[in-house]
UniProtKB/Swiss-Prot annotation:
Protein name: 1-deoxy-D-xylulose-5-phosphate synthase
Family matches, as CDD domains: TPP_DXS, TPP_PYR_DXS_TK_like
Organism: Chlorobium luteolum (strain DSM 273 / BCRC 81028 / 2530) (Pelodictyon luteolum)
Cofactor dependence: Mg(2+); thiamine diphosphate
GO cellular component, one term: cytosol
GO MF annotations, alphabetized: 1-deoxy-D-xylulose-5-phosphate synthase activity; magnesium ion binding; thiamine pyrophosphate binding
Residues holding thiamine diphosphate: 77, 118-120, 150-151, 178, 287, 372
Length: 632
């Protein structure tokens, strides 16, 4: 890391920014930006968003006192500069690493982190709630919500602004408008948030007004024309929309002009009641590769040249395809033959690999923005029209649409396929993004078929089975990252709903595994065999309907039963098997292995599997201890 950061080296806390001049603040922003580029090149992490708000972050800490005032960073992946300036610079190299600082704001990590974030569109609600609490207590601290235009596509943001206008509390909403979320933002609001200088009607009328002013000598007439221009501008800018919600609107202003930012924030600091400052920024600002490919540089794994952005070419065998790629390619393969297949994403086309579908069948691809609830009910509408909607959504974000899944899809038994991406642990993004609960909350939904593939071919077959051989709603959950490779058939095989498969037969304990844990169970079995324990291994494939016939048959002769899942230990496969066997006359000892009943931290997948006991060694140790413990 470069040590020539004369201003940044002097910043031990945000208080050190208070006496800096505008010129010094800009120098500090430049130093922060350079350090961030070096940091991400070394360790990886979220990138382009923090580059885009560097000046804004410095200006906020110059004007506000985050030991008392509250700044809520929506989503939170743009808060790296904030962390540098709030006493965590020396720990930034541990960012997102096991035992290190988190990649998102966390209230237990620093008093300067006002609210824990990770999901989109929550900041205004949190700031409004804190403002209401402040008002009840007679406090004077300031509340600020920093939200991007991508997060503004989420309905929760509008619910909060609608309420905030009614509360009339002193809250500043800063709209960071970079025309992007992770991928380019979607919808009517994006089109509304266009710089007024690009509006042809406004510019034509403005030229006419200024030409008229040049002919006038009367100052009163000139002032009247200026007021007319202001009124016209208000009618054509987003201000009219936000003002209708009860927020005073200011802007848009250049989010990279330090002087304008500081002046505007100082003005906002003194104004009562809710207001919105519209700041226009460039995602990836200051690093040309990120400016030119903002989606591609939203986050990076590191190892790139800090000038060119080039990464060293990998040598050796190529990486196996990711589950996301297998899903996207299989869906396109079927969609090219079936015009009824449609695809829906909530602002994550590239993350889910639905960008492949968008290129192949753009007229049947729908990016609804950060609006998971709408995505699910929209899919329900498509299903009622006889189409085959596939809604690809991260497990952690599906939590936001559970009501719609139950009420609008399952209750009507509509044929919607949910491709649940990032199921299980996701690594460095941590507890806000782990998909730890989907088997549990989906298990209780009547009529919902739930599947989990153990490899790439099973994912292809499950997607085909879901689209063509199952009626009603279907959920397929699969993990982030590598599918493990292996040959893929060109055709698809129908899987019998509610039927598992025995992978290997043994003599003693039976390991019932599902999804990503099937391979882990196979590896654990190899370790157990060295200890003289030879278990049966079952790939359950389906959580619902559960293969009770296979469970009963194996339980009849099993000495011990073990369930293994990359899901909360509560409510998933272990609970389903335990509930089923509860009425069995034979009481076979049962061990449930899964994610413990707590939120799992961030870190590498290897670290997290080791901590939770879901790596092969951990599973083998659990089974060995269970198998050798006398039954009373």
């Amino acid at each position: 890391m470069n040590d020539t950061r004369p201003l940044l080296d002097r910043i031990l806390s945000p208080r050190d920014l208070k006496k800096l001049s505008t010129k010094q603040l800009q120098q500090l922003a430049d130093e922060c930006r350079k350090e961030l580029i070096e940091l991400i090149a070394m360790n990886g992490g979220h990138f382009a968003s923090s580059l885009g708000v560097t000046e804004l972050t410095v200006a906020l800490h110059h004007v506000y006192n985050t030991e008392e005032d509250r700044i809520v960073w929506d989503v939170g992946h743009q808060a790296y500069i904030h962390k540098m300036l709030t006493g965590r610079r020396s720990r930034m190299q541990t960012n997102r690493k096991y035992g290190g600082i988190a990649g998102f704001p966390k209230i237990h990590e620093s008093p300067h982190d006002a609210f824990g974030t990770g999901h989109a569109s929550t900041s205004i609600s949190a700031a409004a709630g804190m403002a209401a609490g402040r008002d009840l207590k007679g406090g004077r601290e300031k509340m600020v919500a920093v939200i991007g235009d991508g997060s503004m596509t989420g309905g929760m943001a509008f619910e909060a602004m609608n309420h905030l206008g009614d509360l009339k509390s002193d809250v500043l909403v800063i709209l960071n408008d970079n025309q992007m979320a992770i991928s380019p933002s979607t919808g009517g609001l994006k089109n509304h948030l266009v710089d007024i200088t690009l509006n042809k009607t406004y510019n034509k009328a403005r030229r006419l007004l200024w030409n008229s002013m040049s002919l006038l000598n009367h100052e009163g007439a000139k002032n009247a024309l200026r007021r007319l221009e202001d009124g016209m501008k208000a009618a054509l800018t987003p201000g009219a929309f936000f003002e209708a919600l009860g927020l005073r609107y200011f802007g848009p202003i250049d989010g990279h002009d330090m002087g304008r930012l500081v002046r505007a924030l100082k003005e906002m600091h003194e104004l009562p009641n809710p207001k919105l400052l519209h700041v226009v920024t460039t995602k990836g600002k200051g690093f040309l590769p990120a400016e030119e490919n903002q989606s591609g540089w939203h986050a990076h794994s590191g190892g790139f040249d800090t000038t060119t952005g080039m990464t060293a070419k990998k040598t050796g065998a190529p990486d196996p395809p990711k589950y996301q790629e297998i899903f996207g390619e299989a869906l396109v393969e079927m969609a090219l033959k079936d015009p009824a297949i449609t695809a829906i994403t909530a602002a994550m086309p590239s993350g889910t690999s639905l960008d492949l579908f968008e290129k192949a069948a753009p007229d049947r691809f729908y990016d609804v923005g950060i609006a998971e609830g709408h995505a699910v009910t929209f899919a329900a509408g498509l299903a009622l029209e006889g189409l085959k909607p596939v809604c690809a959504i991260y497990s952690t974000f599906l939590q936001r649409a559970l009501d719609q899944l139950i009420h609008d899809v399952a209750l009507q038994n509509l044929h919607v396929v949910f491709a649940i991406d990032r199921a299980g642990l996701v690594g460095e993004d941590g507890p806000t993004h782990h998909g730890a609960f989907d088997l549990s909350f989906l298990h209780a939904v009547p009529g919902l078929t739930i599947m989990a593939p153990s490899d790439a071919q099973e994912l292809r077959d499950m997607l085909h089975t879901a689209l063509y051989h199952i009626e009603g709603p279907v959920a397929i959950r699969y993990p982030r990252g590598s599918s493990g490779g292996g040959p893929l058939r060109k055709d698809f095989t129908r899987l019998e709903p509610g039927r598992g498969r025995i992978i290997r037969e043994g003599t003693g304990p039976v390991l019932f595994a599902i999804g990503s844990m099937v391979q882990a169970a196979v590896e654990a079995a190899a370790l157990l065999e060295a200890e003289g324990i030879k278990p049966d291994i079952v790939d359950m494939r389906f959580l619902k309907p559960l293969d009770t016939a296979l469970i009963d048959r194996l339980a009849a002769s099993a000495t011990h039963i073990v369930t293994i899942e990359e899901n909360s230990i509560l409510g998933g496969l272990g609970s389903a098997v335990s509930d089923h066997l509860a009425s069995s006359p034979k009481k076979t000892p049962l061990l449930k292995i899964g994610l413990p009943d707590r939120f799992i931290t961030h870190g590498s997948m290897q670290d997290l599997y080791r901590e939770t006991g879901l790596d092969a060694a951990g599973i083998a140790e659990h089974v060995k201890e269970f198998y050798r413990t006398p039954v009373h």
